[in-house]
């Protein structure tokens, strides 16, 4: 995997210790079991998905390595349920996205037990103060950090390096169940194709107007 490659490269450059390398390898070995447990959250997530069906828009926030997960969550919600959604880096919220927050806006917040957890929680407080409904997706050990969240989805504790992998699972389940509750076709989303059709570039094609 890319993570294993990055770990090997970091070790070769003397950037991590042998102990840290072994910790990461052990965490990778345990990841399939954690994903399996997280896939059992359908019943917990279904009520949240039902509440999202009435929303016109939603905001996804993630800081540091969880920013791409926020983008993925927003994309999946748009693709499957046709609800407008945007993903942003939590630390950038003050520079524009905060203007989108209004009373009752669903804010799906991604939080890991890492060095930026405190800052991320502070960003979420600002969203709450402006009327945002916080749906927190986090590890079990970090759930109490945001005690003002309206709803909390917890996954097993995981190494911070692997948090994006594990937190992506409930984000995708939420999008899937929201679409299911709305009655949209999750297998054939509107206007989307599962394959890409492209024109082969040839000298003849280049001459066409």
Give residue ranges: language-model regions.
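Residues within alpha-helical segments
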Residues: 71-75, 121-124, 128, 207
């Amino acid at each position: 995997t890319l993570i294993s490659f990055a770990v090997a490269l970091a070790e070769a450059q003397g950037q991590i210790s042998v102990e840290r390398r072994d910790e990461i390898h052990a965490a990778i070995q345990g990841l399939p079991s954690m994903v399996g447990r997280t896939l059992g959250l359908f019943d917990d997530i279904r009520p949240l998905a039902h509440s999202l069906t009435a929303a016109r828009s939603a905001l996804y926030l993630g800081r540091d390595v969880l920013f791409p997960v926020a983008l993925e969550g927003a994309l999946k919600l748009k693709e499957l349920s046709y609800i407008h959604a945007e993903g942003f880096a939590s630390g950038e919220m003050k520079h524009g996205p905060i203007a989108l927050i209004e009373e009752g806006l669903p804010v799906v917040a991604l939080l890991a037990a890492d060095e930026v957890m405190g800052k991320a929680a502070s960003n979420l407080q600002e969203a709450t103060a402006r009327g945002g409904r916080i749906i927190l997706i986090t590890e079990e050990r970090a759930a109490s950090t945001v005690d003002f969240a309206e709803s909390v989805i917890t996954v097993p504790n995981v190494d911070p390096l692997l948090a994006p992998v594990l937190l992506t699972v409930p984000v995708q389940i939420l999008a899937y169940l929201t679409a299911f509750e709305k009655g949209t076709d999750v297998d054939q989303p509107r206007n989307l194709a599962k394959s890409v059709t492209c024109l082969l570039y040839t000298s003849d094609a280049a001459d066409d107007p």
